[in-house]
Amino acid sequence: MGRGRVELKRIENKINRQVTFAKRRNGLLKKAYELSVLCDAEVALIVFSNRGKLYEFCSTSCMNKTLERYQRCSYGSLETSQPSKETESSYQEYLKLKAKVDVLQRSHRNLLGEDLGELSTKELEQLEHQLDKSLRQIRSIKTQHMLDQLADLQKKEEMLFESNRALKTKLEESCASFRPNWDVRQPGDGFFEPLPLPCNNNLQIGYNEATQDQMNATTSAQNVHGFAQGWML
């Protein structure tokens, strides 16, 4: 009569648990050794007890080489499959960006008044509202720029006015400093010039009353003009 089926569950008795662990561990190590010898397989076995004690078996001379081989086989496949996931993610991102670019290009054409036949009434109203808002913003910015330019011109005008007034004041001060030198004159500076004496260059041989009267009139006129010219100087 065969053995009945043993239920697998934690052994509550501590002593029985330790005895069972020792038996099963030895059997597992034996099976690993037999597998490596019979099948020429590279086998590595690592067992930790409930107290943290290490039990190991390796069919090769170094456990680390077997572990490195295991890491290359396990994580290398993950690294190989990872680029495909990154490629898929990049492609999805490309599709999203392409859709955004298409929407922006269509919106740009609509703002230019193109491809409006495909839009509904509601979309046309939204487009009209957007254009009105853009125009108001453009006018506001344009007005602000003009006000800024006007303020700059007013500042330049004030600066020029102040500079002109300073130059005018300096010129008046310079003229005031030179005026006394022109107003004050000494008696012996030659301000009054002597009147020229009348002179008759005609040589008279004989006496003629008409000629004498004409000469007297000319001399009188010369005296008057000479006095006026000297007084004007």
UniProtKB/Swiss-Prot annotation:
Residues 3-58 form the MADS-box domain. SUPFAM superfamilies: SRF-like. Residues 87-177 form the K-box domain. Keywords: DNA-binding, Nucleus, Transcription, Transcription regulation. One of its GO terms (molecular function) is DNA-binding transcription factor activity. It holds the Pfam family K-box. InterPro entries: MADS-box/MEF2_TF, MEF2-like_N, TF_Kbox, TF_MADSbox, TF_MADSbox_sf. GO terms for cellular component: nucleus. It is found in: Nucleus. One of its GO terms (biological process) is positive regulation of transcription by RNA polymerase II. This is MADS-box protein CMB1. It comes from Dianthus caryophyllus.
